[in-house]
Amino acid sequence: MTEAECIALKQQAFRKYFHSLNEQQQQAVFSVNGPVLVLAGAGSGKTTAIISRIVNMIYFGDGYAQADGYLPEEDAVWLQAYIDGKEPEDVERLREILAIAPIRPWNILAITFTNKAAGEMRARLASTLGEELASSVHASTFHSACVQILRRSIERLGYGSDFAIYDADDSRKLMKSCLADCNVSEKQFPPRGIVQEISNAKDA
């Protein structure tokens, strides 16, 4: 086989493994280095693409984009049989042939915005990767991920890791207490309004 034929065969095997994805989803999955922006409506398969991208990173690394022209004849025969449906799917064999610089699962951070979505992401990763690999991926909400980082590293900023996180009601109660300590009227400075101003200042 020529170098170009070897590369084409390897990339065809990738597309076979991720055959349930459409062309646009596969393009996102195979783009390992750098950011990828996926714009699509609800229920169109964004989460599926994200899960598959994580799986590709862990199993194959940048094997699709960096596929080289080296392929022993035995592997070439097996890959062609796999592509033709004559060999059952063997992830470990595929990894041996196709993987280039696979990414360790604990180096992957998958962030979403709701606990429900984070739970779904973890469950789908476990069903594909198995519990052991999936549990090493940091899949969580944005807030949970930030809390983990702070708990682990906040002492570098001179603070303790035993901090508490206040919700809106906690924040209002604290502001009321501060106003009382300073003998400031709540009618003149409503606690809710001050808390909102502080929030706006942080977002500015």
Annotated model-derived regions:
Residues A28, F113, L133-V137, I154-A204:
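ATP-hydrolysis module of ASCE/P-loop NTPase motor domains
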Residues M1-G160, I165:
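P-loop NTPase Walker
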